[in-house]
Amino acid sequence: MHTKYQHGGDIYSNKVSIDYSANINPLGLPQGVKEELARCIEEPVCCVYPDSQCRDLVKALADYHKVTQDWILCGDGAADLIFGLAFALKPKKALLLAPSFLEYEQALKAVDCDIDLFYLKEENGYRLDVEELCKTLERANATYNTTAVGCSDQQKSTSEANNGYNILFLCNPNNPTGITVKKEQVLKLAETCEKTNTFLVVDECFEEFLDEPEAYSIIPFLEKLSHVFVLKAFTKIYAMAGLRLGYALCSNEDVLTKICQVRQPWSVSGLAQRAGIAAL
């Protein structure tokens, strides 16, 4: 029996004139992307295997974000990387915000991860109380989390018991509420996650819609945050949902290697790679 489709953007099960379920740029594909895709049809892009390492796209993204190419991993949309991360790390216990993006939970359930929810309260406008979230992590991790990914052998040896969270997902801006968390608060959360050995995933896929995305992104700080994994996508801002293109930034190359080991080799099509470069 097939699993019922739960993501937004399902314009196929029923006729839809205006789709409010998927937050995609209503302006559509950029003109430069359209022109690049037309060139791809004339060239043998669709007739050959794509570069499994997305080298040209990775270089373009590294230049765009001013980071080393070794920190970047491209995927078949951000969802591909979410599932890849779950299968690579196989966390035992996770903390998710609610409401938030559904596919975090789906990916974690696929690896039999226990999930707790940190509820965003309607009376507070669904705003995240970072202080309380940090306290929740600390209470759950009265001792070091010995099964966490990315923690040192010395940290692992400091504890024999673990009741804490292996992984935490933060969507910023949050989907579906649109509520944001300033980078100073995200960095505070990252500091707590480092202390509790909780791997932090920060989904920044909607940040390009903000007036000042630099006030929220923690990408410039990744060099010192080996336990943080940032998700980005071309899906929303460039209206490329049908092409499927996302990417992750992480300074922990061991984590990126583990993800590559559990994924198919050609997860990003040649068309998507060329479109991504054109979009940048």
Regions found by a protein language model. Give the residues of each.
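N-terminal "arm"/small-domain region of PLP-dependent enzymes with the aminotransferase-like
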Residues: 1-48
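PLP-dependent aminotransferase class I/II
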Residues: 28-30, 227-280
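Short loop-beta-helix segment that forms the pyridoxal 5′-phosphate
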Residues: 50, 62-84
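Short acidic capping loops at alpha-helix termini that bridge into adjacent secondary structure
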Residues: 68-72, 93, 204, 226-227
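Conserved PLP-anchoring active-site segment centered on the Schiff-base-forming lysine
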Residues: 88-107, 121, 135
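Helix C-cap/helix->beta junction micro-motif
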Residues: 111, 195-196, 225
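Active-site phosphate-binding strand-loop segment of PLP-dependent enzymes
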Residues: 122-210
